[in-house]
Amino acid sequence: MKKSFVGLSVVVITLFLTACAPSKEMQEAKKRDAEFAQAVKSINLETADVGSKPDNSRAIVEAAIRDQLKDPESAKFSEFTEPRKEVMVENRNFVYGYSSCVYVNAKNSYGGYTGKQLYWAFMRNGKVLRVKNTNDAYGNIIFIGRPVNCS
């Protein structure tokens, strides 16, 4: 009886320890994350192909932000920043281009103005590829390890 109890205990403990071991998928994910973190360290915006600098950045950024608003006609834009070289991630690949920030005050669903909110827009070759309200969850980061920079 004692031997069977010890044998059963060994089997149960082995099962618990096996369940605690990281899965192959988890190990692969950690490896990819480590490779990505290393690639982030090698970003060089001075030598990257960022495409053409947008000469109509205000117009295309305003249009892209208006597309996201409840009441696009009420939007008031102020304090645009000059487009600067930037990088974002799309499907685990770096995309180089330009970013700009702007304050937007627009009406919400109740018809009241929200107050000035800072938006970040990413552009490449005259097109806006991403817009973020920096007040939203994760809105102040481009990707993990790279915060939005509006200065």
Q: Where are the regions that the model predicts?
A:
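Bacterial N-terminal signal peptides that target proteins for export
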Residues: 1-9
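Classic N-terminal secretory signal peptides
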Residues: 11-14
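C-terminal motif of bacterial Sec signal peptides marking the signal peptidase cleavage site
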Residues: 16-19
